[in-house]
Regions:
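Terminal-region recognition feature
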Residues: 1-193
Length: 193
């Protein structure tokens, strides 16, 4: 008998594949995002939420992530806030919800943090690897994309926190880290657990 877990790219039964950032216990109505957020995380989240839609019992999403792909994080946020699910989603920062993970945290109907959890807000950035080369036209396009992401994040956080856009831009530029209490005071979380 082969005891090695099968690799899957979707929510299957009670667990997601070991190589995925997203893990789920469907019976407990719990999803965990632990690790880097990628397009595969978004696909796994879609599958999990669709499977959980068979019941109206609320779902808890635990987050411990250094961040990752901003497009995927915004897509997960949109699913949480605009998806037509028969349940409410509570998001919980368990260790760190940095960068793109902070955006996912904001998607919860209730946003909670463990007492020692931290959040990180910073300006969006692109990471280049594998010897990618850019010319001036590419740089102009990348700069426009970063500006658009920055605007979207500021608008989203203004809506969630009630802060003025200028204050959010300023805090993004300084790479602000929030303790759980500071996150509550800022409006990024609702409760410390």
């Amino acid at each position: 008998m082969n005891d090695k877990p099968q690799k899957r790219t979707k929510c299957d039964g009670e667990k997601i594949s070991a190589d995925s950032t997203v893990h789920a216990d469907l019976e407990a109505r719990m999803i965990c995002i632990f690790g880097e957020i990628t397009p595969a995380s978004h696909l796994a989240m879609i599958d999990c939420l669709n499977r959980l839609s068979e019941s109206d019992t609320d779902v808890t999403v635990y987050i411990n992530s250094q961040g990752g792909n901003l497009t995927s994080a915004l897509a997960i946020y949109d699913m949480f806030t605009h998806g037509r699910y028969p349940f409410k989603i509570t998001t919980v920062a368990t260790g760190q919800a940095f960068s793109a993970a902070l955006i996912i945290l904001q998607g919860g109907h209730e946003r909670k943090m463990f007492r020692h959890a931290k959040l990180l807000l910073h300006r969006p950035r692109f990471t280049f690897s594998g010897g990618d080369s850019l010319d001036r036209g590419d740089l102009k396009y990348e700069d426009e994309m970063l500006q658009e992401f920055e605007k979207e994040i500021c608008e989203l956080l203004t809506e969630k926190t009630g802060k003025k856009i200028a204050a959010i831009y300023k805090d993004m530029a300084t790479e602000k880290i929030f303790t759980a209490k500071e996150a509550i005071d800022y409006g990024l979380a609702d409760e410390i657990i």
